[in-house]
C-alpha cells in the first residue's frame, strides 16, 4: 500500500472541492427558502417555522411553481443533457458523469427542495462533487481503482459538507459506495470528508448542529420497547419500498412528465395546506417529534402525508435525497408506536422513540445501518448512550426485514 504524492494531493483537492460545493448549495438553498417564504436569517426562524406561519394558499402556490420548474427542467436535462449518471454507476467505472449535466441536475434538486419539494438535499452536493471529480481525474494518469476511490470520496465528502458530519460520511463512503474497509480507502474517506467539513465551516456555513434540542431521556422499560420497535420499523420500511416499486415508469425525457409534475406537486401543496412540515426534506417534522412537541394523531397524519408526498414527487420525476425524508417517516412512526406502547404496556420516552425510529428507518430504507447510527448522533450531538437502544432496534429491524423479504421472495 503506497501513498504517492499525487494521490494524496488529489484527495486534498477533492475535499476542498466538495467543501465548496456543499457551502455553495447550502447558501443557495437558504436563499431560495428565504425568498419563497418571505423570511431572513435575521428573523431567527427555522424553515419549518417559516413555512408554518404563512397561509395555506402561500404553501400551495410555491408547490405549483416547483412542479413547473422541476417538470420542465428535468425534461430538458434528460432530452438535451449528456445523460444523468448516478454515483454508484460512476464509482463502478461503468459510465462517466458529465460535469455540466451533473451540476445542472444537482442544482435543480437544490432549487426544488428550497421551494418545498419533499425530497432531501444531500444527493445534490454528492453528485456535483463526484461529477467535478470525474472531470478532474481524467487529466491525471492514475489507476482505475484510485479513480473510483476518488469519485466515491468526493460523493461522501459532499454529504459531509452539507450535513456537517465527517465521520458518518466517511462510513457512508465505505459502507455503501466502496463496499470495503481497507486502510487505504478508510484513510482517503476520512481525510476527504474531514477537509470538506472544514472548508464548508470556513465558507460562511459554520459549525452547524442540525438538531439543536435537549437529548430525550431514555426513560424506563426501553429495552423491551426498542426490540419491538425494530420489528415495527422493519414492516414500515418493507411497505414503503413496495409502494415505491409500484410507481409508474415513464421516460423522464417525455414532455408528458411536465403536466404530471405540475399535478403531482399541486397535490403535495394541498397536503401541505394541512401538514406544512412535509415541505422540504423533513427536518421540520423531526424537530417536532424529537422534542415530543406533537400529538400522536398529528404524527400519524404527518407520517401518511409525508409518505404520499414522497411518492408523488417520485412519480413526478423529481430527484432528491431520501435521508431526511426517511428519518421523518421513522420518527413519526416511532412517536405513534411509542404512544400505543405507553398506553397499553408501560411508560416510554416518546422523544427517544422518535429518535431511534428515525435512525433505524433511515438505516434500513437507505441500506446504510452503520452510517445512520453515527449520522444521527453527529447531527444532534446527543450522547453515545443513545447507541444502546439504537443497537437493539437496528439489530431487530435488520433481522425482521430479512425474514419478511425472504418470505416475499419465496411467494413470487
Range-by-range predicted roles:
Residues 1-412:
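Alpha-helical transmembrane segments and immediately membrane-proximal extracytoplasmic
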